[in-house]
Amino acid sequence: MGRFTQGIYGYAFALLVCLAAVGAFLLVTPQSRTEHIPRVDFSIDRVNAARAASYEVLAPGQVLPDWVPNSTSLTEKNGVVTWRLGFATAKRQHAMLAQSDEKPSADFVNRMANTDKPGGSRQIDGATWEERFRQDKNQRSLVRVFPDHAVVVTGTADWDELTALARTLAPQPKPSPVPSSG
């Protein structure tokens, strides 16, 4: 045993033992070859946004085929209601719907679009949306500013996918007030 603990033989033996251990570990470790994108249920945030917001909340009437809703965030701070809803698109890009009654609306829009430079406009179901593009982030944005709030559809998704998301947006009804116990 002495010759396996000294010199080059010891080094080679230790290396062989380590490689055998790594090989055994790789054989018994489960490996998934399928992509897993976590899915979130945004229905509660959709209802709560419609309840809390002073403006008409827009939400997808139906999630597009092969799209996965993967994030939702509803914040209410100092009377400002902001809802963000993120998706992994069918082409595995990112798209997000963001809306808020933050004032001035331009600050919210510029922050969500990561640019303050309009690049054109497009008609989507009779409504005019402003286009913005930030090349260094590969971020496209569609913007609509209403008198009481702003809506931004943005992400790395291409214009067609962002337009498809904008087409699904529908006003959400205000839910009935929650009865208080008392």
Question: Where do the PLM segments sit?
Answer:
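Aromatic-residue detector
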Residues: 4-8, 22-28, 34, 43, ...
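A broad, low-amplitude sensor of folded, mature protein cores
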Residues: 4, 9-10, 16, 49, ...
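Short, solvent-exposed recognition patches
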Residues: 40-135
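Residue-level signal for functionally critical sites in structured catalytic/ligand-binding pockets
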Residues: 10-14, 18, 22, 32, ...
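A short, solvent-exposed beta-edge/loop patch
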Residues: 26, 30, 118-182
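Charge-rich, low-complexity N-terminal segments
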Residues: 1-66
